[in-house]
């Protein structure tokens, strides 16, 4: 399970150094094999260990290519999916087209989200966090049953 937000730097070749605390799990559970794709709802990237991505891929394969919305989701997620391998130094090379999509330059936030990571431009990440907090503070509608059960 991946959790927490960590500031990492992309080097001049577009590689990011994966924090040590995640490397053992990625090597043990995925042999360092990852898949990176775009997030279709936010200006960030999604980074999955290969076994987790294969579950997503299986779900995508069951969508209908005849349904325009389902086809669009397939096209966006699969069309941008790029395999990357954790190298001996614990780095991942993020494809240029993906870096460009998310506006990633040097300082990047690696955000754990249970079974995957999100990769954000640092400034965009902090802006999103502020927007999310503001949205939560202004909620006037009833919480879903699942959120009501979440006691923090």
UniProtKB/Swiss-Prot annotation:
It comes from the Bacteria. Keywords: Cytoplasm, DNA-binding, Repeat, Repressor, Transcription, Transcription regulation. GO terms for molecular function: DNA-binding transcription factor activity; transcription cis-regulatory region binding. GO terms for biological process: negative regulation of DNA-templated transcription initiation. It is found in: Cytoplasm, Nucleoid. Residues 5-52, 81-124 form the SpoVT-AbrB domain. The keyword Cytoplasm applies. Pfam families: MraZ. GO terms for cellular component: cytoplasm; nucleoid. Its main location: cytoplasm. The keyword Cytoplasm applies. Gene3D superfamilies: Transcriptional regulator MraZ domain. Forms oligomers. NCBIfam families: division/cell wall cluster transcriptional repressor MraZ (TIGR00242). Belongs to the MraZ family. Negatively regulates its own expression and that of the subsequent genes in the proximal part of the division and cell wall (dcw) gene cluster. Acts by binding directly to DNA. May also regulate the expression of genes outside the dcw cluster. This is Transcriptional regulator MraZ.
